[in-house]
């Protein structure tokens, strides 16, 4: 990101504050009304990890997409940049796919296949660069990059969806790993994509207040697929693909463990043998069922049962570690790709 003068920097700052404020305030003030509405309509699910098994409203996806859409539309009319549109349409399509799955349990193949559609706006609007930033330089891969986009959006969308198993994990994970992504986009990407990353980050900050332990609302598939797909779209349009992969390593590892153990793409609600079990004092323990899939949670519980909040904090520590690795990678890229110049 290159600034020709101080006025450009000031303008980016003003736009950044504007984007952050719209996204945050929309989600923050609309979410309590959504919680009340969902409770009134009986759109709730039980939180099985709590002693009283409270009924928690779901989904939060509609409020998230409202805040993100409103902000990105405003940003588009301020910048008229096709990358903003590509990120917006990717987020909307991912949300629609998720809300369908929220309303009706779809087969395991539905989300990864349907999310291919969410990748199309990036391709159709040409909102990508075929020069892939690597750690020690970049690679020009025009033919390979298109299939990579078609793979990346479904993978990242489902990765965030798969790790959303405990209070606050999906939103907290996006916040932690969003920091290196924003920094990378600021350095290697464009002003417009950086503004979009602020939209995602501050919308998620507002949502985390309601999603953190103990959750007042769950994101649902519409929320997690939206967050994951938008994260992926920002990484692609902001020339920060490798940084995103490094930051998301714990979540990617979780998906890899799950798929390698069940050996097929399956909806998590179809799994009969759960990877974790509840003790009498409502702590989570690793399942002893040989048929249960291997997941990140199950591995973290090998040393013994943990409370839900303790387990969430362990996942966040992994996210912090992978994000630090991503930040180190940014420093290396900064010197090898840009020669130490922004």
Residue ranges, per PLM feature:
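"…together with the soluble PPM/PP2C metallo-phosphatase catalytic core" -> "…together
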Residues: 2-262, 321-322, 326, 330-333, ...
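Membrane-proximal soluble regions of multi-pass membrane proteins
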Residues: 255-309
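C-terminal membrane-adjacent module
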Residues: 15, 289-342
